[in-house]
């Protein structure tokens, strides 16, 4: 889906930039935690990956601070479905309620994922859409990626998100996206990306 496509396009761009500029001083790629926290601002678009902790905070493993033009429906979330309410047409990823509507599109690699009735607790999905002010994610597209979970059980405790930074706490080295508290550590790999 577009989140992963952007990720690979950005990585390819950085590789090409490095190849094209051989002989020139190479730009610094990874940012320190202090540089990350200084760069993060409320309203800044980011793409992050991390590991969910027992207290439901997220230890950030990778972060891209993004600049460019974004639309209200450019948000995305990838993770394990924790709850499903077929009647309300709603699922929960981490603690984020994800609602679908009649125009939501469904897909998977095999082409067999056709509707919300196939979403189950434990499914590994990517949703794209709009994160609303009330804390609900309105999905325009749901992709079932459960085959990846079968191949790598470590994904069960991971989360990926693309969206706007809501709050930054420099003292705690944390920020929030979609209500998730995300912790920056010395192991966090981060860079700025132009979209």
Feature roles, as predicted:
Residues 2-195:
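Short, flexible, surface-exposed loop segments at domain boundaries
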